[in-house]
Amino acid sequence: MAAPKNDNVKQRILDAAIKLFQERHDVSLAEIAKAANVSKGTLFYHYRSKAEIYLDIGEQYWNKLSDDLLAWVDNAEKDTSIPRLVRYTFIRGVFDESGVLRLRLFVEAISGEEGVVIKARLNDQYARFKNILKDRIVERMPGADGEQLAWLLLALVDGLMVQNTLQNESIDINAFIEWMAANFSDFQ
């Protein structure tokens, strides 16, 4: 039997880490190695810290979100008007199963040993996604301040993701999303 490809091993490690991180925060590298069915040495070869694992998880999340958004918004057969773009961005960002993991990534960025590295990568990922949103907003709302509107969307998505993760029943997130979709053009 051939040895597994590095990409497969790395993905197995990430999949195991995601599952464990969704259950709790205090997961050791040894637990991740065991869950991924790899040796500690193999895990260390790919990841020297939990922070590196969190970063790759975050990178996968942002890449998937970006790729999905681009595939949707660039599909000429779809209605990708501003209300639909806003609704799509909120639904994908707020209700995605990665909410708990994203919050843990924020915690690592703020208080983890490698916080500076995580902050830099997170900021790069936010800037990349902001630029995608900005370009799509300006295409649909010529003359609008796409930069600020994209940041507004991202800040609101993160805030609603926190409220959704906390299961805050005092806010009707779906109603808020519909209100934003209907009124977003007024913010230009």
Region locations from a protein language model:
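Alpha-helical DNA-contacting segments of helix-turn-helix folds
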Residues: 54-64
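Hydrophobic alpha-helical connector segments
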Residues: 56, 70-96, 139, 149-153
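Amphipathic alpha-helical segments used for helix-helix packing
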Residues: 94-120
